[in-house]
From Swiss-Prot:
GO terms, molecular function: ATP binding; ATP hydrolysis activity; ATP-dependent peptidase activity; sequence-specific DNA binding; serine-type endopeptidase activity
A GO biological process held by the record: cellular response to heat
Name of the protein in question: Lon protease
SUPFAM superfamilies documented for this protein: P-loop containing nucleoside triphosphate hydrolases, PUA domain-like, Ribosomal protein S5 domain 2-like
Biological role: ATP-dependent serine protease that mediates the selective degradation of mutant and abnormal proteins as well as certain short-lived regulatory proteins. Required for cellular homeostasis and for survival from DNA damage and developmental changes induced by stress. Degrades polypeptides processively to yield small peptide fragments that are 5 to 10 amino acids long. Binds to DNA in a double-stranded, site-specific manner.
Coarse class of the protein's main subcellular location: cytoplasm
Group of enzyme by EC: hydrolase
């Protein structure tokens, strides 16, 4: 076997032909199609020039997408080639040329030219081969490469292996073998160029062997994948063919009608004939059933149609529950299940009375709005019981997709009707009482706005023609009695306009005691298996439980605490053999643990700049403390506590009013100019907004600047204008309940809210002294512990404004805390 050794000659200047996505090897003949202008000129120059004798230097581009490659876009090593046929002109101005690779060369430098690319090239000499018969490793490597290439040829199936392998077997020179094999491999240009640039024969064999093995692995994986796919396709075709044969056999034997498929078809036909479908729905059902009969039962489309027909035919078309309304019985049911809320129950009875007369629902949709735990959902259940209708409930909290209401179109995988149609099927009648729970908790995003989708559902003029996207036919919702619940009126205006709002306020302590005694305790005893005489709780203990372990407008927390007491009672009866458990104020803490809340006034002492305000939230009323401190500055006011825009504007308005009337309040203007006020509303992590804290902010600023403390037992609420007027507020009942829970004795409210006092329970009026104020001056007179001494324009004391002091105590300035 011969091993080549290259002999270098002197360099020469040659025209250069850049190649796209191809590498030419020595001793390889190949046709090329050349179209670039410079490349064509290079070929013509090589043929016409007597010095080059049809010689041209071929070199591969690093990036084949570049049309006009620069020297840095070309590899350094290429091949000197002979043009062995005349150029053949093609219609697109390109030329076809046949070239034959001669030997390798390395570019020394490129020579600039406008018409063609030339380079000075150092050419490798012809190989001189020496004998080395003892090189067993090289011979083994040569044979391995040829065998691997033979396997590659068989796997690639691009040509007969013997046509390629036989000529290679005849070649003895290692480098020529490598060149011939590399030219046939379907590998990347960079890999071929790498082989071209390696001179050591043994290294060249190793590189080409590794590339062949990689290509064999890829081809083997492709063949396995092809066989797998082919097998799957053949299996599917076989199943389809057998199913068609089975159908034909069943048809011949008359067994098709007795099979499962026949039963399903018979069931569909029977339902279509017996169900009181609308004309549109019946036509749709018949059309889809005809399509279904012609389909393969296991096909995906047949499954979709079958599911659709089940939904369409299982709806309560034309089914109405005979609901006879007895107003006396309805009132009795409402009174038994719900304590208080007389006005709400009266409105429901009025609604039922009209419904009894007209026999159809044309009035507004009722929307029960109130804090959690006041009985909105249970009230809707009682309404259903009172009118003798089926009750279904949809929880709308967190729904953001319009398709949850209207359904998904059948084109989607896993599509199904919306919640309205789903629950109509569940109700199994066309006139249930439908509760839309937590309607204010819906959201919206890119998938649509469910609140807008509800507009059609709640419109009594149009819901007769409600169309679900899945059903694609109209379904009559006009006989459905819709009731909605919400914690707040944070609803889109068009949706709110379709409903009549009924407010459910929080319960007083006396009402909670009555609810616990007559409703919760009997229910919980039954749930925990306690007999009537095995467990009892005193009224005093109930009051303490409400005050120290719950702080809510409703009764859910109270129910949880009572359930906790009864669980411990059951455990004590079974383990300690106690016959009776009695819960009193003395042992309440033993059962419920450490007190969760404090019951008493919001502040233990009357302090400067500390004012008790009142707030109204979705969960009811609450006490809102407002604090302020004075720091040296430039007359600015800062506020913290996660305040909303409306509340920030209210603070600015209150500050401007007090500063503009500083002399009246006995404050020198210099005190504002030389100091900043920092106003804070705890708790800092809870968002707060609204204008009703204006009077409390004014009082806090006046108290701070005059150094007069605010009465700890006084709370206030009201919006303040720049003229000092106190404007009306909302949520008065909830705010007064919060004041009562905080042991507030006096509450100052706007005079415009005096009319709302008729809605306030008598026990609240007895326990709280409610004072009406038209302007902020009246509020400050009641709230501050000391009289205000006004200053005239000359900064002289002129007026002493006396105020009524509820505690009849005026602490000395030395004892005031700030």
């Amino acid at each position: 076997m011969s091993i080549g050794r290259a002999v270098n000659f002197n360099s020469t200047v040659l025209p250069v032909l850049p190649l796209r996505d191809v590498v030419i090897f020595p001793n390889i003949m190949l046709p090329l199609f050349v179209g670039r202008e410079k490349s064509v000129h290079a070929l013509e120059y090589a043929i016409s020039s007597s010095s080059h004798q049809n010689e041209i230097f071929l070199i591969a581009q690093k990036d084949g997408s570049i049309d006009n490659p620069e020297p840095e876009n070309l590899y350094e090593v290429g091949v000197l080639a002979n043009i062995i046929q005349p150029l053949i002109k093609l219609p697109d101005n390109a030329v076809k040329v046949m070239i034959h690779g001669v030997r390798r060369g390395r570019v020394i430098e490129y020579i600039s030219s406008h018409t063609l690319l030339q380079a000075r090239v150092a050419l490798d000499g012809h190989y001189e081969y020496g004998e080395n018969e003892d090189n067993i490793d090289l011979e083994a490597l040569r044979r391995s490469v040829i065998d691997a290439f033979d396997n590659w040829c068989k796997l690639s199936k691009k040509s007969r292996p013997e046509i390629i392998i036989d000529p290679i077997d005849q070649v003895k020179e290692v480098n020529q073998i490598v060149d011939m094999i590399a030219s046939h491999l379907n590998i990347k240009v960079s890999d071929k160029q790498n082989i071209l640039e390696v001179y050591n024969p043994k290294e060249r064999l190793k590189k080409v062997f590794a590339l062949i093995e990689r290509e064999i692995s890829i081809l083997s994986a492709q063949n396995r994948l092809y066989k797998t796919i082919k097998s799957q396709v053949e299996s599917t075709q076989k199943v389809y063919y057998l199913n068609e044969q089975l159908k034909a056999i069943q048809k011949e034997l008359g067994e098709f009608e007795n099979g499962d498929e026949g039963n399903i078809l018979n069931e569909f036909e029977k339902k279509i004939n017996e169900t009181k479908l609308s004309e549109e729905a019946k036509e749709k059902a018949i059309t889809d059933l005809k399509r279904y009969k012609k389909m393969n039962p296991i096909s995906p489309e047949a499954t979709v149609i079958s599911s659709y027909l089940h939904w369409l035919l299982d709806l309560p078309w034309g089914k109405y529950k005979d609901a006879k309304i007895n107003l006396n019985a309805a009132k009795k049911i409402l009174d038994e299940n719900h304590y208080g809320i007389e006005k709400v129950k009266d409105r429901i009875i009025e609604f039922l009375a009209v419904l009894k007369r007209v026999k159809e629902i044309k009035g507004p949709i009722l929307c029960l709005v109130g804090p959690p735990g006041v009985g909105k959902t249970s009230l809707a259940k009682s309404m259903a019981k009172a009118v003798g209708r089926d009750f279904v409930r949809i929880s709308l909290g967190g729904i953001r997709d319009e398709s949850e209401i209207r359904g998904h179109r059948k084109t989607y995988i896993g599509s199904m009707p919306g919640k309205i149609i789903q629950h109509m099927k569940k109700a199994n009648s066309c006139n249930p009482l439908f509760l839309l729970d937590e309607i204010d908790k819906m959201g919206s995003d890119s998938r649509g706005d469910p609140a807008s989708a509800l507009l059609e559902v709640l419109d009594t003029e149009h819901n007769k023609h409600f169309t679900d996207h899945y059903l694609e036919v109209e379904f009559d919702l006009s006989s459905v009695m819709f009731v909605a619940t919400a914690n707040s009126l944070n609803l889109p205006h068009p949706l709110r306009d379709r409903m009549e709002i009924i407010q459910l306020s929080g319960y007083t302590e006396d009402e909670k005691i009555s609810i616990a005694t007559h409703h919760l305790i009997p229910k919980l005893k039954k749930e925990h298996g306690l007999h009537q005489k095995e467990w009892e709780i005193t009224n005093e203990a109930l009051y303490e439980l409400i005050r120290l372990y719950t702080r809510e407008s409703g009764v859910r927390s109270m129910e949880r605490e009572l359930a906790k007491l009864m669980r411990k009672a059951v455990k004590a009866i079974l383990t300690d053999k106690n016959k009776k458990i009695s819960v009193e104020t003395g042992n309440l803490q033993d059962y419920l643990g450490v007190r969760k809340y404090t019951f008493g006034i919001a502040e233990n002492e009357s302090l400067v700049g500390i004012v008790t305000g009142l707030a109204y939230t979705e969960t009811g009323g609450d006490i809102l403390m407002i604090e302020s401190v004075l720091i040296p500055g430039k007359g600015e006011i800062k506020y913290t506590g996660k305040l909303g825009e409306v509340m920030q504007e209210s603070i600015k308005a209150a500050y401007s009013y007090v500063r503009s009337n500083c002399l009246f309040f006995g404050i020198k203007p210099e005190k504002f100019q030389n100091n900043d006020i920092h106003l804070h509303v705890p708790e800092g992590a809870v968002p707060k907004d609204g204008p009703s804290a204006g009077s409390a902010v004014c009082t806090s600023i006046v108290s701070l600047m005059t150094n007069i403390p605010v009465n700890k037992s006084v709370a206030m609420t009201g919006e303040v204008t720049l003229r000092g007027r106190v404007l009306a507020i909302g949520g008065l009942r909830e705010k007064l309940l919060a004041a009562l829970r905080g042991s507030i004795k006096t509450v100052i409210i706007p005079s415009e809210n005096e009319k709302d006092m008729q809605e306030i329970p008598a026990n609240i009026k007895e326990e709280i002294n409610v004072i009406f104020a038209e302007n902020i001056d009246e509020v400050i007179k009641v709230a501050l512990m000391h009289p205000i001494t006004s200053i005239d324009d000359n900064n002289e004391i002129s007026v002493s404004t006396s105020i009524e002091n509820k505690d009849n105590t005026f602490p000395s300035s030395e004892t005031l805390k700030h």
